[in-house]
Structure formats: structure tokens, C-alpha cells
């Protein structure tokens, strides 16, 4: 029988439509046509992007030239522009302000063909460190209230360029979905004097059936009330409110579980398009860090949001998270295939501190 499940953080209900239950092989494969031709993110084309605002490059090389490992530039076609004042104002009953913000692109690797999960853990750590540096810098601007970090992988997920990249957008408001999540966390904390994400980590670790993988610092799970098939959350086990406050050792552990989670998704689902979104605390006037807990949400693009979802806000998910977690645990990232590897629920294949071969 179908179930309605309530997300314990924001109170959102979803329908787990077991009558439509799907395993990975039941989903139609979304294949993005390979584009050929010029790529502005490839080494040698640095002059075709705005100047770099952050870079990890070989010592002695000049800015905006090749021989870099990670590169961050302003988006050539920004959603928000960094120049100007907010000029908040009313138009009758309506509110508006100038579209002030920042929009940056983090190029993950010089290699055009390498997807995020194929990067060595050390390279993913460089990417996460670059995210941290740029978020700290952008948060110094008093006009900005929130910094959204996200990745669109594949044309169906909104990617317009194939070369691996992450985007950062600083906004002058705290987006509604973030406010809903913060309010849900605060309500739980005021009621129980505990962080709800810490409670989720403790409960999921104890029952194990929705765990995808883990290490000493992070837990990767299929959430109890997922909006989408194989929606995956990566959550710090210790209470951490703000991503940009994370030390290098925590980021290294995060890199390992991120990589393994995406490897399992790619192997189980035949490399689907996906989005991942970083949820972290707002910047500037945000003071209370006791109740909010940063995390990453990964959403493979396997189904489409249609009229019922738009009209009601209820999502229909044909794959129970327990079945999704079990299937993701069956694949074997170490051997690069989808055969079961006998890994116990929640047991990582290898310590995250081990570096993969170059």
C-alpha cells in the first residue's frame, strides 16, 4: 500500500507510491548528447572567461594562464550582479529590490572528461577548500544574506557546459526553502533542546536500513521522506552549523563520502544526470549555531515534477528509500561494477584517509 511520509524538518509530506515501485532498471535512461567544440573552461582558454578570483596553480605560473588545478571565476552571464545598492522599495503591495548579488563558477579540474566522482579524493578536497575560501570572502559583503552552492550535472539537470563545475550564488535574501528548514530546526530545538539533524544521524546509524555509506565523520543516507528516487543526504556526524567553518580534516572526510555516494549512484543508475545542493547557515547576522546543521543533498534526475506536484506541493516518489539504500549498498565502487560486494549496511569500503591511485 502507498504511504504518506512527513519530513521531520520542514513538515513536507511525500507520497511513497509502492504500487508504482521502481528499481533502478525500471527508470528510463536519460542520455545527454555529447557536445563537441570549444570549451571556455579547458586549459588554454583562460582569456575566454572573466579573470580568476581564486585559483590553485603551479608555482611561478601567471594568473589566468594554464597549469592550474582548481579555478574560480565570475559567471560571464550572472543571475545577479555584484555592482550597485539593494534599494529596497515598494510598488503598492509588492516589494522589490535591485538584483544585487554574486555569481561564480568553480571549475573542478582541468580535465574536460573527468566527472566529479572520478576525481581523486585529494582533488575533491581542493574543490571543497575553494568553496570554503569563496564562501568566507563573499560573506564579508554585508549586502549578502545567503550563499547557495550547487552543481548541475548533465543537460537534464540544467548543465549548459559539460566541463565539471560548481556554482556559487550569493543572494541579498535568505531563500524561502532555507528559512523553512531553519524554522523547522529551531522548532525542534526549542521543543527538545537537541539538533534534529543530530537526532537523524543517531537514529539512522542505529537502524542502518537507510544508510548508503559512512566514515568516522559523515553519514550518507536515503532520507525517511525523500522527494525523489535515490535522493541522498550527506550529513556530518558531529554538530556543525556552517560549512565554511569546517577544518581541513573534516573536509577530507566529506570528500571521501561525497565521492563514494556519487560513485554508488553512478554505478547503480548508469550515470544519471543529477543536482547536488549544499545547505548551510545564512551569513552575516546569523548568530545562533545550536540548532542548524549543514549537509549536502544529492538528487538524481530520474523522474519529472508534473502537475500534481506543482499544484499540491506533494511529491510522488516510486522508490522507497529503504529499497534505494539497499540497492546502492549492493554496488561495488572499488571494482567499478554493480555486483554485490557483501558490504554491511553503513560500512565504507575503505578508510577515507586512503588516497585513490593517481
PLM regions with names:
Residues 1-358:
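HIT superfamily nucleotide-processing domains
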Amino acid at each position: 500500500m502507498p504511504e504518506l511520509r512527513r519530513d521531520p524538518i520542514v513538515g513536507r509530506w511525500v507520497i511513497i507510491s509502492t504500487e508504482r515501485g521502481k528499481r533502478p532498471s525500471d527508470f528510463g535512461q536519460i542520455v545527454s548528447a555529447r557536445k563537441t567544440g570549444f570549451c571556455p573552461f579547458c586549459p588554454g582558454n583562460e582569456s575566454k572567461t572573466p579573470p580568476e578570483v581564486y585559483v590553485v596553480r603551479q608555482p611561478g605560473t601567471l594568473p589566468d594562464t594554464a597549469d592550474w588545478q582548481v579555478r574560480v571565476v565570475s559567471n560571464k552571464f550572472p543571475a545577479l550582479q555584484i555592482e550597485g545598492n539593494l534599494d529596497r522599495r515598494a510598488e503598492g503591495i509588492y516589494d522589490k529590490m535591485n538584483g544585487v548579488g554574486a555569481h561564480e563558477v568553480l571549475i573542478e579540474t582541468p580535465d574536460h572528461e573527468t566527472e566529479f566522482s572520478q576525481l581523486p579524493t585529494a582533488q575533491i578536497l581542493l574543490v571543497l577548500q575553494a568553496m570554503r575560501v569563496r564562501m568566507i570572502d563573499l560573506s564579508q559583503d554585508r549586502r549578502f544574506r545567503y550563499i547557495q552552492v550547487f552543481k548541475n550535472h548533465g543537460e537534464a539537470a540544467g548543465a549548459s557546459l559539460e566541463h565539471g563545475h560548481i556554482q556559487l550564488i550569493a543572494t541579498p535574501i535568505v531563500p524561502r526553502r532555507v528559512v523553512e528548514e531553519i524554522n523547522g530546526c529551531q522548532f525542534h530545538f526549542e521543543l527538545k533542546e537537541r539538533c534534529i539533524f543530530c537526532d537523524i544521524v543517531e537514529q539512522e546509524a542505529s537502524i542502518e536500513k537507510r544508510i548508503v555509506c559512512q566514515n568516522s565523520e559523515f553519514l550518507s543516507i536515503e532520507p525517511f521522506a525523500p522527494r525523489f528516487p535515490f535522493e541522498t543526504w550527506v550529513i556530518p556526524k558531529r554538530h556543525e552549523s556552517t560549512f565554511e567553518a569546517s577544518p581541513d580534516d573534516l573536509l577530507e572526510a566529506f570528500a571521501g563520502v561525497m565521492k563514494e555516494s556519487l560513485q554508488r549512484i553512478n554505478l547503480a543508475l548508469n550515470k544519471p544526470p543529477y543536482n547536488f545542493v549544499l545547505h548551510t547557515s545564512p551569513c552575516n547576522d546569523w548568530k545562533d549555531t545550536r540548532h542548524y546543521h549543514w549537509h549536502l543533498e544529492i538528487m538524481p534526475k530520474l523522474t519529472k515534477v508534473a502537475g500534481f506536484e506543482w499544484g499540491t506541493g506533494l511529491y510522488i516518489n516510486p522508490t522507497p528509500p529503504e529499497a534505494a539504500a539497499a540497492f546502492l549498498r549492493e554496488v561495488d565502487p572499488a571494482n567499478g561494477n554493480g555486483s554485490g560486494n557483501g558490504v554491511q549496511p553503513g560500512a565504507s569500503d575503505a578508510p577515507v584517509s586512503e588516497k585513490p591511485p593517481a
